[in-house]
């Protein structure tokens, strides 16, 4: 029996689409189409004049999107960091009523051994979101130094055993090249103890390598900055993150644009000094809060456990 790698349960589905506050004639962006769970719900709430622009850099996601036959829907393959260029091409800068980003990796990507994202399935050590370009995890591990690998595991995986893991990978690749996910996972389990029965020892390392290979954090920074320009006044930014590195970027971005700087404590400022502090500082976002999955959703979809949704609204400055 064939395995259905496209089976995917969207996390915080209703909450995310509700946060967008869909207008019947609005123009919306699903910046991480995946398998279209969020897109389909958005389309169900749009009127005949509404539009949904979907983006994904995964060829498999694009193939799935071709199955949506709706004149209000368009899907393109590109990194979401290039979203501003795409919207400029459509002459829609400042016209977007909502942007949805469901960050991280999808269930279909994890479930397909050939993608190389999971330590639970033996497959090629690839890890690229877009399999048509870039360097695979196998190729990078083959050429990276111990210092490079250590930095990646520490910064993108917060892995305490980063140096020992990196040394083991480096020396193993000198003996015989690591080519599969199971080989890499087994090597890591000889170094990292099972301190948490619910968390595989290779979790942090696989996350770190994947983030590095796909330049994920830089992608997030770029798409968030682009959102300010392409959103209409009153437009919503909705972001679902799954680990602290992602959420830290989203939280910082929203707070940066929704809070004025606090004056230094313990120092008396003149009216002019206070005026200078806030000169040319305009709030561009309204922080609308955060939402976590319900206990019921987590029971149905354990993947939702680590999810956190943050949303904001563009202000008229």
Curated annotation (Swiss-Prot):
GO MF annotation terms: rRNA (cytosine-N4-)-methyltransferase activity
Q: Name a single GO biological process.
A: rRNA base methylation
List the GO terms this entry assigns under cellular component, sorted alphabetically. Answer: cytoplasm
Alphabetical list of InterPro entries matching this protein: RsmH (IPR002903), SAM-dep_MeTrfase_MraW_recog (IPR023397), SAM-dependent_MTases_sf (IPR029063)
Highest taxon above the source species: Bacteria
Query: What task does this protein carry out?
Result: Specifically methylates the N4 position of cytidine in position 1402 (C1402) of 16S rRNA.
Family membership, please give it.
Belongs to the methyltransferase superfamily. RsmH family.
Spell out the protein name for this chain.
Answer: Ribosomal RNA small subunit methyltransferase H
